[in-house]
Amino acid sequence: MKRLLLSLALAGGLAACAPSLDAPPPSACLVGAPYLTAQLFFGRSVAGRVPVSDAAWQAFVDGVMTPNFPDGFTVLDAQGQWRNPQTAEIAREPTKLVIIGVPRDAPLRARIDTVTSTYKQRFAQQSVGIVVADACAAF
């Protein structure tokens, strides 16, 4: 019984640490400096064609991603799912998730636009998912 009560107390304490979706971004960082994080979701299926190959992806990273984000980024393999807005069909495809962190005052939008528009054009993609959030970072 004591273990159950302790587990419930710890779970409640951890839940209290979760950020509120309605809370404004923190004005000061406890660690590091104010940053923006961007998550870019690159689908690798191409309608009616062979999916974007590893070699084609790496060429895109080397020629487009790296020049736009020379300080670094992280690439993860993922499996994506989304609803096509024109057909309402569910699409599932292999995905590359790219996570980028930049200082809060760095120009981000133009670089993201360059990367995503190049990917869409080069690989006949309808869209690239983008999530941008405030963060604190230290390296």
Regions found by a protein language model. Give the residues of each.
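Solvent-exposed, acidic/flexible segments
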Residues: 50-54, 58, 105-112
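Mature extracytoplasmic domains of secretory-pathway proteins
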Residues: 56-95, 100-104
